[in-house]
């Protein structure tokens, strides 16, 4: 205030302050008064929100006899009479049954629509008929007062909240705020939050530092097309959204940061895939300085299994160390560079015994076989399996089987009969076995066989352990491959990797 003494002949004053002079205490009083005025509502139909005592998934038998205040959405009402009804109140945490026993509150409910926001003040009592399927199924609340905090204007909702997943996708997206009230939909967001929190805690526990890298950056080749953002002050120039924080984390390592991680957003302009959402996704991104492959493996073998065991469907994950499978072996035995090791089936090579059997698609091609022992599938199930394989891989699957007497039957068996002994010996077949086959160049035959393997494992009992997660590391990827669409040499994976020392001479 010293600089302003010449400009102001009088001190600050306030009509509400004693003597008109403004003191620190007066300032605080004025702030409190103004805050109080802010919370005064001028519209009578808007009611200020008061703190609830419990949420709708919280009350238990221990709360019987307590007066509580609940706030949530009006989900449903089962009307028994004009002065008796059973209301379901829902919030983020769950549902509570409200037993209305007064005509006044029943009339209030009849004047509002489902999904209106209401406040209930009432007393908790034990249910006479308990619901073991609900966390709050042992209690109910008898309301003494119901206050409508926000009316839903529509008599009919675009879909039933608890069945929103059955609605048209465009309708769900238009009314996403209603869709997210569905506990099944909401649970995915809750799960993601918990997984990310535990991942973050585990990485920090391993001395990693979380660092957020820039989103607007320059373009760098990562294997997909970039999303571009026009630079407003530089016409004709663009930022790129990062496909991965690769360059930034390498910069961090060079600058002396020893261990980095982030839950990184990645943007890739590519079509949707079975294992990847289009446009954007998030990944646990990490980098370690002065580390080798086994150092990285050791960290993740400690971080991942507990997360999957805690939040996964099966609650069991393979123990470290994980299997190490070379890329070529993975493609040869499993037809995939990310094999599902829960499936007991393996891919075998049948080129030598079947390429010249007289069946057109096999001629001059590689032939791969998947043998399912003691197979019990019906012809209808086999046809569906072949159709599913073609949808996923774009290639046909062929088959034959050995009946209980060891005779070839079904599918392309007539082309195999003359080579039966060689085929049985090469594939180790026995009576009751089923053989599914793929054909094409090496890569096509392998990938199609991989789809066959996964389809049989998932469709027929006895070939897949479905109650656990099986992890592995696929190592020794090739640096380049011929692109399926371009036909040109392309990176097989992210090129930002340490050199394999035995390849230095190349």
Summary of predicted features, one role per range:
Residues 1-3, 48-49:
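Accessible peptide chain termini
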Residues 1, 12-13, 34, 65, ...:
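Exposed boundary/loop context
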């Amino acid at each position: 205030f010293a600089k302003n003494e010449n400009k102001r002949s009088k001190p600050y004053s306030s009509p509400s302050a004693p003597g008109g002079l403004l003191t620190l205490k007066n300032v605080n009083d004025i702030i409190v008064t103004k805050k109080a005025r802010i919370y005064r509502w001028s519209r009578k139909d808007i009611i200020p929100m008061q703190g609830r005592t419990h949420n709708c998934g919280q009350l238990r038998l221990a709360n019987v006899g307590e007066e509580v205040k609940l706030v949530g959405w009006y989900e449903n009402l089962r009307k028994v009479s004009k002065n008796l009804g059973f209301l379901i109140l829902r919030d983020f945490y769950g549902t509570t049954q409200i037993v209305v026993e007064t005509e006044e509150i029943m009339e209030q409910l009849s004047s509002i629509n489902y999904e209106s926001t209401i406040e209930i003040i009432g007393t908790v009592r034990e249910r006479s008929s308990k619901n073991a399927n609900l966390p709050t199924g042992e209690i109910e609340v008898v309301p003494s007062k119901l206050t409508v905090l926000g009316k839903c204007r529509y008599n009919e909702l675009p879909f039933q909240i608890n069945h929103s997943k059955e609605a048209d996708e465009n309708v769900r997206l238009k009314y996403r705020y209603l869709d997210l009230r569905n506990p099944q939909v909401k649970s995915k967001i809750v799960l993601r939050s918990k997984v990310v929190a535990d991942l973050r805690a585990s990485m920090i526990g391993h001395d990693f530092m979380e660092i957020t890298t820039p989103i607007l950056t320059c373009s760098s080749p990562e294997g997909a097309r970039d999303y571009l953002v026009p630079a407003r002050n530089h016409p004709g120039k663009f930022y790129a959204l990062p496909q991965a924080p690769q360059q930034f984390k390498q910069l961090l390592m060079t600058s002396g940061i020893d261990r980095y991680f982030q839950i990184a957003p990645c943007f890739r302009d590519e079509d949707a895939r079975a294992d990847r959402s289009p446009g954007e996704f998030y990944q646990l991104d990490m980098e370690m300085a002065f580390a080798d492959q086994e150092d990285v493996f050791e960290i993740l073998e400690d971080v991942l299994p507990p997360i999957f065991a805690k939040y996964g469907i099966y609650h069991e994950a393979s123990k470290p160390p994980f299997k190490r499978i070379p890329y070529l072996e993975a493609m040869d035995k499993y037809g995939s560079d990310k094999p599902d090791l829960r499936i007991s089936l393996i891919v075998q090579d049948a080129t030598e015994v079947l390429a010249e059997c007289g069946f057109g698609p096999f001629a001059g091609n590689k032939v791969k076989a998947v043998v399912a022992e003691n197979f019990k599938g019906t012809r209808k199930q086999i046809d569906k399996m072949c159709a599913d394989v073609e949808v996923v891989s774009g290639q046909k699957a062929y088959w034959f089987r050995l009946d209980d007497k060891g005779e070839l039957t079904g599918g392309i068996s007539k082309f195999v009969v003359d080579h039966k002994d060689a085929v049985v010996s090469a594939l180790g077949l026995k009576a009751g076995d089923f053989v599914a086959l793929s054909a094409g160049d090496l890569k096509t035959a392998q990938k199609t066989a991989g789809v066959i393997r996964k389809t049989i494992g998932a469709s027929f009992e006895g070939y897949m352990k479905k109650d656990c997660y099986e992890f592995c590391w696929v190592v020794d990827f090739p640096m380049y491959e011929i692109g399926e669409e371009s036909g040109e040499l392309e990176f097989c994976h992210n090129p930002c990797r340490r050199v394999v020392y035995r390849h230095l001479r190349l």
